[in-house]
């Protein structure tokens, strides 16, 4: 099995976001978020990453400054499938999707 994660594009500026089974909510408010990203432009509840039977999906939670997939702003409330190597940005916090094999 593979472990999916989002790795910071700025050399470890932000901790890795590990996508364990289930949902990961990214935002700037401790309550309700799985991953806290206290940066300017990041909404309290910014985006959600979900694991489904056919892959990993990204969902913008009506954030103020948007969620971007490979440089394009995604539409809030719609699921976007993400793949290894994709670039994801929450406001201007940029990450790349990587996988590693679990032993």
Please annotate each region the language model reported:
Residues 26, 68-103:
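C-terminal boundary/linker segments immediately following FHA domains
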Residues 13, 33, 45, 76-78, ...:
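Residue-level marker for the onset of beta-strands and adjacent loop->beta junctions
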């Amino acid at each position: 099995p593979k472990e999916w994660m989002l790795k910071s594009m700025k050399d470890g500026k932000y901790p890795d976001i590990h996508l364990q089974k289930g949902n990961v909510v990214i935002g700037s408010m401790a309550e309700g978020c799985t991953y806290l990203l206290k940066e300017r432009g990041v909404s309290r509840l910014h985006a959600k990453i979900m694991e489904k039977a056919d892959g990993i999906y990204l969902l913008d939670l009506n954030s103020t400054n948007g969620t971007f997939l490979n440089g394009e702003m995604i539409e809030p409330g719609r699921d976007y499938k993400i793949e290894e190597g994709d670039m994801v940005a929450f406001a201007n916090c940029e990450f790349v999707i990587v996988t590693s094999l679990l032993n």
